[in-house]
Amino acid sequence: MLRCLISRPQLLPTRLPLATPSCVSRRTFLGFTGGDTKEQRYILKRVFNAPLHYVYPAVSEVSLYKLFIPYCTDSFVNKRRPGDNMPTEAGLRVGFQQYDETFVCRVDCTTLPGNQRSVVAESLAHHLFETLHTQWLLSPHPTRPDASVVELILRFKFKSQLYNSVSSIFGTRVTQVVMKAFEKRVFQLRKEAMDRPPTGDAGH
């Protein structure tokens, strides 16, 4: 779902994945072409101490990214799928100092065999990126019913050589920061659910 994924002028250690393009910037370096720079690829896998029914909503609901992803100043959903209300087009606005970028992506949220979930975000515009692909693969932990395996796959190439150079330095760190932000978000959602008073006749 989400062309979520994650995100701004990719030049600071904290925002890359879930995101999509549609650039509105106070300052950019799009005049510097990307040359022969290769597409960058990052893969990160973690175990979250929460079942999928907490993880999947955190990843798929792009409109709430602004609440927990560093430097994400806005997040929104333009289109949703009839029936389950999952996002099909979403975006992020990321700002840091004089940089301000907005990204819009096509989002695809699907259920896979083995009770897995997939959230894929692909860029819709190409004035900032040559390519941008973000995928979250969410799986039940094979031996721990109360845990999930979360894998983030990120592929991108900027049109700006400067952005490509800077992101090649910070890419690994950015991916880790994004993953950590989602882990904290899932922990928060689970804690809120556990702290919520039971419904029904519990007070009688």
Swiss-Prot record:
The way it spans or sits in the membrane comes to: Peripheral membrane protein
Task: Please cite one Gene Ontology biological process associated with this protein.
Answer: cellular respiration
GO molecular function: any one? Answer: ubiquinone binding
Identify the main location.
Answer: mitochondrion
Q: Which key words are in the record?
A: Membrane, Mitochondrion, Mitochondrion inner membrane, Transit peptide
Q: Where is the transit peptide?
A: 1-24
Q: What function is annotated for this protein? A: Required for the function of coenzyme Q in the respiratory chain. May serve as a chaperone or may be involved in the transport of Q6 from its site of synthesis to the catalytic sites of the respiratory complexes.
Concerning its family, UniProt says: Belongs to the COQ10 family.
Describe the protein's quaternary organization and the partners it interacts with.
Answer: Interacts with coenzyme Q.
Protein name per its UniProtKB record: Coenzyme Q-binding protein COQ10, mitochondrial
Q: Which organism is it from?
A: Eremothecium gossypii (strain ATCC 10895 / CBS 109.51 / FGSC 9923 / NRRL Y-1056)
Record lineage: Eukaryota, Fungi, Dikarya, Ascomycota, Saccharomycotina
The record's gene field reads COQ10
